């Protein structure tokens, strides 16, 4: 063990404990296991819970050890010692005596838990950790259980088999109120369904008490259970699903579960068909899914087929065109399965009308006729049709258009026949499931390729109008689509420091302006800059100072403008001007004015490199003036700094600082628009926002303290949901894979499927260099909701369900990146 560890732990020397952070991680890495064993001895002593010195030493040492393990990536080497210390905490009291006060051993358990379970994707570590983690669900404090649940949920994404043996304990923890663990159940169900099935009724009873994300995971569990075709599960969940179907939030998900059930247990839904009809009337957009359920139930026997056909036919006449394809497929599937319902001419009904309304009328008429025959099977009886729907006996010679039409109609009929003979549980009629080749080639005419003989004649009258044969195929419709400003203004003036290189306000929230002085700067300027003279104390010669006179004349306008502009454009805390190969750029640093407990930028800063430094300098100048009741002079210290920055960026033929500020007091609107656009492009507004209450720009956490408390729970996901990930890097190849992603801890995770590459790994936030929406110039119809994540060696492209969802993902990822950076900055300064 390292000498300093031996000294601190052996003598429990709190005064030297902070020195551990001055050691290099690699220098102490070999000592970590031994140090953990020594900590276990100290924490197990009888007086540990009352000995504040020992507790402080242990806390500092654990922080140093876990930091070194993370930085050296040696978790597997020290996992056994970590888990041993973690397990020993279970022998002691973990429940707090008072509110918001953890016991000493609960603090140890929390620190160790965070270190271990952040490595949920490492199998050797999780094999040791999961059995202990499950014990904490029943023994730990409420806060500890909640954090443990978050980490176990993440572990279930990649290592569900390790949790399967503990399914019973997980279910009991959920029933005791730990609903976060519901997200684990879909992952472990296939391995251990019995414990979940035994408590399924109790789990379903929790639905009304759950939050929206927890309800979603409960429904995911039912979907997984439905696929296993367990009759007992079906009997329990169908009434529950029907009851909750009236809630529009989840009716799409619930219908997908019911479709799964209808594929293998259609009779379970038979008694609920009237209720499903009512719901379909209330939510017409569910008609396509309802049609599949009615089609599946109709295949049970002829009596149910007739009943379901009446509903499907009525929808065919009433629904919009997007549902007609699905409805016709289900109708044809039922009439093919029970040929006696329509007789031998069922095919003619589909072929002899160019109107879905007419098809529906003919089908309804035949259903009534067959019902009047008292259910007798009439396999050979000819169906009578009105004269105007009969095929003409004489046909014109077949033209080239005629042949093309025949090919299209035959292709569509073959498609219907092929799909009709596919089992209901396999058929997918949603347009989302149609292959790209089908979208390209399978097209409907105005009559949806069902008006076979009517379109072939020159002029055939129908009930709803007249169609001219000479118009051919008409317009083809594809099967595929569809106060004080700024940073908290005070009245304390800026002062220059003794080195003359920085300008800072006594209030930490005020900006500082840094200028790297050129070597050839006149000594007199340097001396003037270094003098500590309060701004208001300067007495210029009014008639010689144009800037002073101009500001005096327009002071009220300047202050009003500064007040408004500070709400739209943040004022940087610090600014440097740097030369690059082409021009000068401004490097701007922004921090949060509040610096609350969960602040994203209390120790770190948001850095922006701008190719347009002069508008920023002008905005900073206006901000400076807004701080003082009197006009600023060109001799003012802060103005001299801004002037020096301006001159460093000044191009040939451009105005001097004084001329620019007097001739154009305010930045041009196009320049402001460019600044705001740049801030949007670098996702500044994801992590900062102007607080009307505080009158200042604050970080996301400080602006949303109620969210910050939830987000900062260990392992709590910032966001989760389905995204489409682009599988091929070339733009012209549009191949996407849908995955369920979770942003939590320091990673963006996804649930792996059987077909996924085993080498696919989560995205480590520490390796992310930038995140941005797909550039507008690259956006086309396929990428209106896409964003990119850039790491040191790869670019990921994702697509959300809509632009709003994409913005939510972008903001959450940027907040997570800021959190990680802030956490790193805090750890550097801890105990030093």
Curated annotation (Swiss-Prot):
This is Ventricular zone-expressed PH domain-containing protein homolog 1. Its main location: membrane. Belongs to the MELT/VEPH family. PROSITE patterns: PH_DOMAIN. It comes from the Eukaryota. CDD domains: PH_MELT_VEPH1. Residues 497-519 are annotated as: Disordered. GO terms for cellular component: plasma membrane. Residues 499-510 have a biased composition (Polar residues). Interacts with TGF-beta receptor type-1 (TGFBR1) and inhibits dissociation of activated SMAD2 from TGFBR1, impeding its nuclear accumulation and resulting in impaired TGF-beta signaling. May also affect FOXO, Hippo and Wnt signaling. The PH domain is required for membrane targeting. It is found in: Cell membrane. It holds the Pfam family PH.
